[in-house]
């Protein structure tokens, strides 16, 4: 089947999620427009061992060509995102988290947004985190530079142009994403914090537009296991991967003074928490992780971004 024949490719990158992934796929199969359109579901699965029930469900769907089930041998979020982009057979690709409940009109609204906004390369849908409800917000960016749109409320009910992204409910023109190299694989797996913001900043700098579409809504379950939570808590860890992405983003895209302020703010903010107030012995542990993260990010920022090679970008 050619890209022209497919209307939409849904890509779900999953890590250490079993039954919640099966539930998410089940919700998608029952959405408006799914049965009436040429839509494919691609699961880029980084889970080594599924529960027996999940393994059976995924295998059955794969054998019946309900899903395309791609297995990867190790977790690497941006690598998996790029794999999904390359495998997609539609001109439009919709990335979704593996632990969501989608609104019944999710697919229709993403497709409609691209039809209404042909100059837009990326559409970000509404994301309701646990306990959140939709909220009318007349948003105006209060900050510029690295922090521009960092505080954008993705539960807003007002559509607008944005300069940030959340990959858990993001549709894009495949050609646009490929032209800019996809997602940067310098981000340390599996956390890869700020990779969406880096992607958005890179596209906006190149003249691309990103539209926030509130009608394309999901409820994010924020499952307590799997995903980026598989590496434990950032509060008491000296590991660098929790902070690497934030520093790397700043070093890649910030002007010198903006970058310095951003990095220093993060360094001190990370220990100004209720947890560290009651567990002060973890402050030096956390700072050790932040120092390691900064110097790893500094080294990585001096290298070319690890994007999809030109030779692999089949538009």
What are these regions (language model features)?
Residues 72-88:
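Glycine-rich, basic loop-to-helix element that forms the pyrophosphate-binding segment
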Residues 142-163:
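Short, flexible, basic/aromatic active-site loop/helix in glycosyltransferases
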Residues 105-138:
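Conserved donor NDP-sugar-binding/catalytic core segment of glycosyltransferases
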Residues 93:
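Short aromatic/hydrophobic "clamp" motif used to bind/position activated sugar donors
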Residues 17-31:
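Short, well-formed alpha-helical segments that are part of the catalytic scaffolds
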Residues 189-199:
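Acidic donor-binding loop at a coil-to-helix junction in glycosyltransferase catalytic cores
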Residues 237-241, 255-315:
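Non-catalytic, C-terminal membrane-associated alpha-helical segments of glycosyltransferases
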Residues 27-71:
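Acidic donor-binding segment of Leloir-type glycosyltransferases
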């Amino acid at each position: 089947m050619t890209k022209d024949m497919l209307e939409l490719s849904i890509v779900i990158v999953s890590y250490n999620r079993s039954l919640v992934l099966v539930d998410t796929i089940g919700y998608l199969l029952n959405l408006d427009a799914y049965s009436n359109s040429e839509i494919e579901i691609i699961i880029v699965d980084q889970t080594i061992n599924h529960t027996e029930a999940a393994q059976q469900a995924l295998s059955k769907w794969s054998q019946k060509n309900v899903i395309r089930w791609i297995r990867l041998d190790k977790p690497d979020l941006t690598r998996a995102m790029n794999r999904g982009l390359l495998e997609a057979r539609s001109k439009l690709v919709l990335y979704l988290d593996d632990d969501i409940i989608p609104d019944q009109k999710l697919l229709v609204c993403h497709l409609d947004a691209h039809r209404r906004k042909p100059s837009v390369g990326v559409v970000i849908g509404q994301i309701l985190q646990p306990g959140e409800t939709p909220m009318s917000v007349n948003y105006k960016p209060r900050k510029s530079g690295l922090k521009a749109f960092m505080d954008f409320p993705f539960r807003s009910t007002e559509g607008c142009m944005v300069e940030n992204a959340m990959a858990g409910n993001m549709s894009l023109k495949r050609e646009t994403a490929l032209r800019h190299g996809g997602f940067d694989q310098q981000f340390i797996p599996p956390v890869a914090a700020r990779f969406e913001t880096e992607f958005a900043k890179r596209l906006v700098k190149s003249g691309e537009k990103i539209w926030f579409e509130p009608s394309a809504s999901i409820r994010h379950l924020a499952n307590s296991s799997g995903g980026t939570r598989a590496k434990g808590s950032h509060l008491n860890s000296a590991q660098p991967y929790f902070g690497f992405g934030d520093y790397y983003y700043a070093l890649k895209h910030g002007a010198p003074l903006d970058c310095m302020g951003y990095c220093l703010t993060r360094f001190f903010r990370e220990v100004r928490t209720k947890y560290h107030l009651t567990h002060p012995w973890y402050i030096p542990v956390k700072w050790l992780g932040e120092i390691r993260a900064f110097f790893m990010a500094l080294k990585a920022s001096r290298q070319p971004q690890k994007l999809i090679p030109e030779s692999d970008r089949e538009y």
